Structure formats: C-alpha cells, structure tokens
Amino acid sequence: MRELVRPARLAPGARVAVVAPSGPVPEERLQAGLDVLRGWDLDPVVAPHVLDRHDTFDYLAGTDADRAADLQAAWCDPAVDAVLCARGGYGVQRMADLLDWEAMRAAGPKVFVGFSDITALHEAFATRLGLVTLHGPMAAGIDFIKNARAQEHLRATLFAPETVRVITSGGTPLVPGRARGVTLGGCLALLAADLGTPHARPGARGGLLCLEDVGEETYRIDRYLTQLLRSGWLDGVGGVLLGSWAQCEPYERLRPLLADRLGGLGVPVVEDFGFGHCEGALTVPFGVPAELDADTGTLTLDRPALCSPG
C-alpha cells in the first residue's frame, strides 16, 4: 500500500470550511464548534447548506446535489486551507458520485477531517485524490465541543503534527506483536458498504487498519467483518487497531466475536485504541506509513501527518 500525499499543516488565521456531507446539523452545536475553532485563531466559514434538512428524508442535511456542491466548492476555493465535516450520520454514499474529482484533484491538497459516515470520503480521497486525511472529531460533534482531550489532540495534529507523531492510546493487545503499514480505515459498516463502489480500494493489503462502529448489534458486526474476510479485502493486512464500539453490546460480549473474526489473520490487533465514537477521541491520520505496537498500545507515524507549508 502506497504512502499518500500530505497536505500542509495549518497556521494561525487559516480559513477552514465547515461542510455537512451527511446528516442534519443542530445549529447550537455548530455555533459551539465554531467558537472552538475561533479560539484556535482559525477563520471558520460555514458552507451554504450546512443547516439544511431534506424535505422528504429528514436524516439528510439537504439534497444530495447541495451537499456535494458545498463540499466541492469548499475544496476548490483557493482561500480555504482545510475542510472540516460538521457531523456524520448518513448521506455520503448518496452524494460521492456527484463530486467532480478531477476538479478537486486540480485544486491541490488541503486538510480534510471527519469520521463515522465520513469514512466513505476518507476512502474516496485516498483512491481519487491520493491524499492523507484525518480521522478525527467533527465541528458540531458533542465530543469536539465538550472534551478537552479530543480538542487538543486534533489541534496539535493540525498545527504541530510533529508533537503527536507517536499516538499513545492506552490500548491493550487482543493479538500481541508489532506491525508496519500505511494507516487506513474508519467505520466498519461503511467500509463494508463501500465494497464494489467506484471509489473503493481493492483491499487493505499492506495497511494498518483502524476499525470502529456505533449502535450495531454483534451479529451485524459479525456480518461486516465476514463480508470483508470473504471478499478478500482483508488479505495481507499488516495489523488492526480497534477503536470504540459505542452503543453496541457490552464489550465482554463483543470481544469474543472480534477475536474470532480477526484472530485468524495472524497479525497484531490492538483493542480500545481510543478513536471513533468515544469520549476524548484521538485523531488518527490515514495514508501515513507507521508502526503499530499492540503490546504498548502505540502507533508511531514515520513522519508527521501534515507537512510544512511551501
């Protein structure tokens, strides 16, 4: 798996666009998130349709065309240094094919942040733009608004990524050992749903795969993992990092399933790595070569997630 292009780190005064590719955004949470960004001396701008709600499908932040237009306009605006998603939910799969990927590639690299439903965009940005992205807190997310650890880890990644090149999670080994690879992954359900789509990568070979999910029954997690196994998508994966399983069954019931489905891969697996739908979620860059030490619960990036400007 190849290393991807790193966008430039942010500096004080950088303009960041907030977009909503998925679900509708509560205005009060958006405003609170904007206040956090302003407190970092950033200049946040809100895309035109962020507060929209679809007339028929109220789980969408407006129409597919409007959500895609907001993301593309923000990405192609030369004054914008970073694009932050407001929240997840559902909707990226509906709008991803409406994006003009050639125009977005021509606009050059910039920082992209999000998680959950945004997993589909992490995959598309990797396959279509060849770009490092950040799996991290979103601008209108409760954890981002209220949790100092989530805020500070994202802030350090954006402004001083060399200070968080070693990500220490406190995680423990499900399968001990060390592994090297290029980071990738996100929400398990979205990775399974992405198979066979125009922006899906052929597999996780040579990768350090990050997996998490929210609100799923254990049998569904079994189904998603089994689909990835049967399709060959997990063939040759270097190691696995397991994040949070919020609103799923108690972990003592889920853990045997994860061991059953992933233990046969013969690679290190670390659990409770502290990313995803959890309190104080860590920011994990995707597309960066790294070493996983499952025994110590650390991920050491070969180089900072974002490069120096110029």
Swiss-Prot record:
CDD domains in the record, alphabetically? Answer: Peptidase_S66 (cd07025)
Keywords assigned by UniProt, alphabetized: Carboxypeptidase, Hydrolase, Protease, Serine protease
User: Which GO terms of type biological process are on file?
Assistant: proteolysis
EC number(s) on file: 3.4.16.-
Q: Where is the active site?
A: S116 (nucleophile), E212 (charge relay system), H277 (charge relay system)
Gene Ontology terms: cellular component: cytosol
Q: Per UniProt, what is one Pfam family of this protein?
A: Peptidase_S66C
SUPFAM superfamilies to which the protein is assigned, alphabetical: Class I glutamine amidotransferase-like, LD-carboxypeptidase A C-terminal domain-like
Q: Identify a single GO molecular function assigned to this protein.
A: carboxypeptidase activity
Q: Which family would the database say this protein is a member of?
A: Belongs to the peptidase S66 family.
- What name has this protein been given in UniProt? Putative carboxypeptidase SCO6489
Q: Which organism is it from?
A: Streptomyces coelicolor (strain ATCC BAA-471 / A3(2) / M145)
